[in-house]
Each structure stands twice: as C-alpha cells, then as structure tokens.
Amino acid sequence: MQEGKNIWSLILAAIRKELSEEEFYIWFENLYFIDATDENIKISAPNSFHKNQVEKRFAKRIKEILIEKGHNTINVEFINSPNDSKTHNMESKNISLKDISTQQDSPEKRTTFKIHTKNIIESTKQYTTKEEIHTKYRNPFLKKKYTFENFITGPNNKLAYNASLSIAKNPGKKYNPCLIYGGVGLGKTHLLQSIGNKTEELHKEFKILYVTAENFLNEFVESIKTNETKRFKKKYRYLDMLLLDDIHDLQKKEGIQEELFHTFNALYEDNKQMVFTCDRQPSELINFTDRLKSRFTRGLNVDISKPNFELRVAIIEKKAEEDGIKVPKSILNLVAKKVTTNIRDLEAAVTKLKAHIDLEDIEIDTSTVDKIIKEIIVYENDNTNTHNKINIESIKKVILRELKLTNKDIEGNSKKPEITKARHIYAYLLRNFTELSTIEIGKIIGGKTHSTVLYSINKIDKERNNDLEINNLIIELMNKINKK
C-alpha cells in the first residue's frame, strides 16, 4: 500500500513540472489514491467526465513516467468513485494533493509536500534529504503581475487603492465586505488581484480564492449537473478570503444569486474577508435580489472613475518606460489628451506607438497619434458586444419613431402617462445598450436625477416580468435598435 502511495506521489511530482499551475489544479486536485497491489494502483475521480478526461489526456504520459522510473509492470487505474472522493478529506490517511510525499529515484532525495487546501498548488522544486516544503495557500488564478506597487494612483482611484491595501494588511477587520465599482478598464481587477497577492504574502496560512463571476456561475452549474453541490458549497464557504470579480454578470440569474447569498452569510458570520467588483453601484444592478444588494452595502462601497489628465500622463509614461519607447513628452501628453476613456485604451495606444516605431521606423508626430487613436476606436468597436456598438442617437430615433413622440416629449417634464412610460423605456434601453451611468442617462433625459432614472429602469424591469405586452414592446424596440 505504502509503495503504491509513493509511486503515485512520484507520478504527481513529475506531471506537475510539465503543466501550468492552472492545468495541474484542474485535473489532479480532485484525484485520490484508493488502493494498490503489486501490479495496480487505483485512483478515485469525482465523476465519469473527470475520469474520462484524465485518461484521455494523461494515461499515456503516466505510463511513460512509470517506465522511466523503473515501474514497468505497474498500471494506474482510474475509477469513477465520487463517494470515495468525498470521504478523502484533509484528515484522510490516503494520499491526495493535500498531502503529497514524493519518493525520488534514490532514498537520499525525498521531497515532502504539505498542501493544506484543495484550491492551491505551488511549483515543484528539488530539495535535499528531509527538507520540507511548507506550501502556502496558492490560488492558480492570481496573477503575480498585479501588485499595489505597479498600480498608479490618482484622485480617481486613491480611495479604492487605500481601502484595498488596508484589506490586504488586515483582512476581515475593517472593510468587510468591500465592493469596488467603476467602468471597464479602470483597474478594478488589478486592485482585486493585488489584494489577493499582498494577502498571500502577509498571511501565508490564508485560503484565498479569486474567481470571476462567470467562472463562479459555470462551476455552480457544473456542480448541479454532476450532483456535487456539497463540494461546491464547501469550497466557497470555508475560505479566509473570497475575491469575486464582475458580479454584474450574475444579473438575471436567480439560482446563483441564491447560492452567493448563503455563501456571503457563511463567510460574513465567520469574519472572513470578501471583496467584489462591479461595473455599477449595487443599487443599479438589474434583476438582482434586494437582500443580496443590501449585503453588498453593509461594508465599504468605493468607486473608480475615469483617470484625469495628470493620471493619464503618468500611466502613459510608465507604460512607455516599460516598453522601452522614447518619444517626446509632448507626444505622450497628446495621447493623454485624446484618449480619455480608460487605462486599457491608454496602454493600447502606447502599444500601437511602439508598433509604429518598431515596424515602420518612423518618428512619431501628431498625425501618427491621430491615426493610432482612430485604430483604437475601431478596435474597440470591433470587439465590444452589440449593445456597446449602439449609439445614443440610434436608440432615441427608434423611441421617437415607434412611440410617435417628439424630442420635447422625451426630454421634457410632461406627466401624461404615455409620455412618462416612454421616458421609463428610454432610460431602460439606454442602460441596457450603453455603459452610461444613471447620472449620465439622467442628463440625456432632460436632467433627471439618479434616483429618478433608477426608478424608471427598475420599473420597466419589473413590468417585463409581469406584463407580456410591455415585454413584447421592449423586445420589438430592442430588435429595431439592433438593426440600426
């Protein structure tokens, strides 16, 4: 039995050197040693899909490793045994990735891995006799390139930065939960990942998990399909820190919202840190349960806005320095003046500057900058979804034509029911087809307040669920807007 465990450990150590952290985590984290004879090692997989995929991807390589290590007669057999997988927890004497003791080719070289959680893998290294690796909790989806040190601060993001750094130093103490909100490409993910990396550095025993809302949803759906919801709950409710990116992607998805609600409560009651990001304030989320929105507002909600000119210049200068670009400061200032959208676009502009310099061997002037800006705009349009391609004027024209209204009607203060309803619909469509905030939408619709616009959006959202006629009208208007 022990010899079989040692051989399986040897296989794991060899394979992990050949795979990325993410791949190793996905395919081997939930495999468990069950039993062994002189000729056969049995490994438990959580479900038939996982078993089949591991066999398809790695059976040949595992056999090669066995031959390389002098175990020609031994076979590794994978078994679909979810019950065995569930019972092999951290206290189990059976071997898994949580307790790997890998025997190398000679007794003088032994590597012992002590991995204390299921979600975390650390790179394999060679150690001399009796050396131990006390691995920390390592999230394979945390990217080391995101740090507080390389996050450039300014008036638009200083509060979010300070709060994030404070959370990393003292998780679960002050700002719990914390929600960072703002538009696309402004640095929300950078801060979220920086929190994870700094916390990992300062609190090595912490179980930290960074996950996008999309992956959180997909994992939840898969757990239902494979009857593994208990495993899913255990994974997320026994963390020290949950970093959930882009929660707006969970709008209109009631099942996962319910699961997140209970996960939130479990972590909150245990004083475990939670940080979320969103492209809008919680109050502006559509088809999102009120009780979950109220949970987000329990702690700190902090926004990141578009960078001002000085910050844009600083971002561009740093990117130019990293890329080894030498151009006059006047050119960098010109880029900062023209690209006012977000950090992502600023960095894209610098990348294109470098391409023009390297490939065309030309001096950058104002006409080149203008050309680059146009390329960025085209690129963004080509890669955004249909909603973002729709401009405000297109939406307005459809509303006026189909509802037989005038500019004065839609932007005025008439209390006529049909005109009031049209303004509600206009606000709703602007929110769904653009990235405008409620304040920006309010300015378009005759200077309405944030609360008025939010009321309009929520009203139409609810009516679509209860009124078939309204729902059909909205669908018809959306189809016409998409054709513009």
UniProtKB/Swiss-Prot annotation:
<dbReference type="Pfam" id="PF08299">
    <property type="entry name" value="Bac_DnaA_C"/>
</dbReference>
<keyword id="KW-0238">DNA-binding</keyword>
<dbReference type="Pfam" id="PF11638">
    <property type="entry name" value="DnaA_N"/>
</dbReference>
<dbReference type="Pfam" id="PF00308">
    <property type="entry name" value="Bac_DnaA"/>
</dbReference>
<dbReference type="InterPro" id="IPR010921">
    <property type="entry name" value="Trp_repressor/repl_initiator"/>
</dbReference>
<dbReference type="InterPro" id="IPR003593">
    <property type="entry name" value="AAA+_ATPase"/>
</dbReference>
<feature type="binding site">
    <location>
        <position position="185"/>
    </location>
    <ligand>
        <name>ATP</name>
    </ligand>
</feature>
<dbReference type="InterPro" id="IPR018312">
    <property type="entry name" value="Chromosome_initiator_DnaA_CS"/>
</dbReference>
<feature type="region of interest" description="Domain IV, binds dsDNA">
    <location>
        <begin position="358"/>
        <end position="484"/>
    </location>
</feature>
<dbReference type="InterPro" id="IPR001957">
    <property type="entry name" value="Chromosome_initiator_DnaA"/>
</dbReference>
<dbReference type="GO" id="GO:0016887">
    <property type="term" value="F:ATP hydrolysis activity"/>
</dbReference>
<dbReference type="GO" id="GO:0005886">
    <property type="term" value="C:plasma membrane"/>
</dbReference>
<dbReference type="InterPro" id="IPR013159">
    <property type="entry name" value="DnaA_C"/>
</dbReference>
<dbReference type="GO" id="GO:0006270">
    <property type="term" value="P:DNA replication initiation"/>
</dbReference>
<dbReference type="GO" id="GO:0006275">
    <property type="term" value="P:regulation of DNA replication"/>
</dbReference>
<feature type="binding site">
    <location>
        <position position="189"/>
    </location>
    <ligand>
        <name>ATP</name>
    </ligand>
</feature>
<dbReference type="GO" id="GO:0005737">
    <property type="term" value="C:cytoplasm"/>
</dbReference>
<dbReference type="GO" id="GO:0003688">
    <property type="term" value="F:DNA replication origin binding"/>
</dbReference>
<keyword id="KW-0235">DNA replication</keyword>
<protein>
    <recommendedName>
        <fullName>Chromosomal replication initiator protein DnaA</fullName>
    </recommendedName>
</protein>
<feature type="region of interest" description="Domain I, interacts with DnaA modulators">
    <location>
        <begin position="1"/>
        <end position="73"/>
    </location>
</feature>
<keyword id="KW-0547">Nucleotide-binding</keyword>
<dbReference type="GO" id="GO:0008289">
    <property type="term" value="F:lipid binding"/>
</dbReference>
<feature type="binding site">
    <location>
        <position position="188"/>
    </location>
    <ligand>
        <name>ATP</name>
    </ligand>
</feature>
<feature type="region of interest" description="Domain III, AAA+ region">
    <location>
        <begin position="141"/>
        <end position="357"/>
    </location>
</feature>
<comment type="function">
    <text>Plays an essential role in the initiation and regulation of chromosomal replication. ATP-DnaA binds to the origin of replication (oriC) to initiate formation of the DNA replication initiation complex once per cell cycle. Binds the DnaA box (a 9 base pair repeat at the origin) and separates the double-stranded (ds)DNA. Forms a right-handed helical filament on oriC DNA; dsDNA binds to the exterior of the filament while single-stranded (ss)DNA is stabiized in the filament's interior.</text>
</comment>
<keyword id="KW-0963">Cytoplasm</keyword>
<dbReference type="InterPro" id="IPR038454">
    <property type="entry name" value="DnaA_N_sf"/>
</dbReference>
<dbReference type="InterPro" id="IPR027417">
    <property type="entry name" value="P-loop_NTPase"/>
</dbReference>
<dbReference type="InterPro" id="IPR020591">
    <property type="entry name" value="Chromosome_initiator_DnaA-like"/>
</dbReference>
<comment type="subunit">
    <text>Oligomerizes as a right-handed, spiral filament on DNA at oriC.</text>
</comment>
<dbReference type="GO" id="GO:0005524">
    <property type="term" value="F:ATP binding"/>
</dbReference>
<dbReference type="InterPro" id="IPR013317">
    <property type="entry name" value="DnaA_dom"/>
</dbReference>
<dbReference type="InterPro" id="IPR024633">
    <property type="entry name" value="DnaA_N_dom"/>
</dbReference>
<keyword id="KW-0067">ATP-binding</keyword>
<comment type="similarity">
    <text>Belongs to the DnaA family.</text>
</comment>
<feature type="region of interest" description="Domain II">
    <location>
        <begin position="73"/>
        <end position="140"/>
    </location>
</feature>
<feature type="binding site">
    <location>
        <position position="187"/>
    </location>
    <ligand>
        <name>ATP</name>
    </ligand>
</feature>
<keyword id="KW-0446">Lipid-binding</keyword>
